[in-house]
């Protein structure tokens, strides 16, 4: 297990989790320098990505101290063991699995379980979630985040799914503590064509928009 520790301070500098799914280690090698340079501090590699263990290990070797590096799509204990063996500093799940959550809490590994209804969200939080992942976020939009925060103002929410430059601040203003962004950030066409200049512009536009908002509300 990796000894590097997840940094909440680093996450809060730019509370966006970039979600990488299905990329090769070569693509990750090309993308991460641009991602870090834009100011992002947290990255998630989903476990259904081929050779994800090597990707996580490479990222830790190259970006330890610069990035929070986590594993996503962790659904059961076997997935958790795989993620922790690779060195994941935090865990993201699409569901609430009590065994996974209790083990993460026992090991002081931040866990972001997926939930949707008020009951699921409260259960996830009560089991020790770092934040509760709201997925799919676009189905009910920012208004749903605001509605959930009304009775549960103490619960930190991280919407995931369909978040892009046009709506990211709407979710933040509704009360989100963080955002999870995948394909809207890691444009597949740009990556396949190795259009690093355009991808850099996209990274910087997203990062700067969220940073500016945080400065305004600080």
Mark where each language-model region is.
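Conserved N-terminal beta1-alpha1 strand-loop-helix module at the mouth
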Residues: 1-86, 106, 166, 193-215
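Glycine-rich phosphate-binding active-site loops on the catalytic face of alpha/beta enzymes
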Residues: 94-100, 134-142, 176-195
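Short, charged, surface-exposed secondary-structure boundary motifs
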Residues: 100-104, 122-127, 142-147, 167-169, ...
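Histidine/lysine/aspartate-rich catalytic loop segments that bind and position anionic ligands
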Residues: 94-139
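Catalytic cores of alpha/beta
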Residues: 76-86, 119-127, 164-179
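Structural preference for beta-strand elements that scaffold enzyme active sites
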Residues: 15-17, 42-44, 66-70, 89-90, ...
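Glycine-rich beta-to-alpha transition loops that act as phosphate-gripper elements at the mouths
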Residues: 21-24, 71-77, 93-96, 113-118, ...
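A charged, well-structured terminal subsegment
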Residues: 148-151, 200
């Amino acid at each position: 297990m990796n000894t590097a520790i997840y940094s909440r301070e680093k996450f809060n500098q730019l509370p966006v989790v970039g979600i990488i799914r299905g990329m090769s280690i070569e693509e990750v090698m090309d993308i991460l320098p641009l991602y870090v340079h834009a100011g992002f501090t947290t990255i998630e590699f989903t476990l259904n990505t081929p050779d994800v263990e090597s990707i996580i290990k490479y990222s830790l070797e190259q970006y330890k101290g610069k990035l929070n590096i986590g594993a996503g799509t962790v659904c059961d204990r076997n997935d958790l063991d795989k993620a922790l063996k690779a060195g994941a500093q935090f865990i993201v799940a699409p569901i609430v699995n009590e065994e996974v959550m209790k083990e993460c809490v026992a090991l002081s590994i931040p866990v972001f379980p997926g939930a949707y209804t008020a009951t699921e969200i409260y259960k996830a939080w009560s089991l020790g979630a770092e934040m509760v992942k709201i997925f799919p976020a676009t189905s009910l939009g920012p208004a749903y985040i605001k509605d959930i925060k009304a009775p549960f103002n103490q619960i930190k929410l991280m919407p995931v799914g369909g978040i892009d430059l046009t709506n990211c601040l709407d979710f933040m203003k509704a009360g989100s503590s963080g955002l999870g962004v995948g394909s809207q950030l890691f444009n597949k066409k740009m990556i396949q064509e190795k259009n690093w200049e355009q991808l850099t512009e996209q990274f910087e536009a997203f990062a700067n928009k969220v940073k500016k908002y945080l400065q305004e509300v600080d």
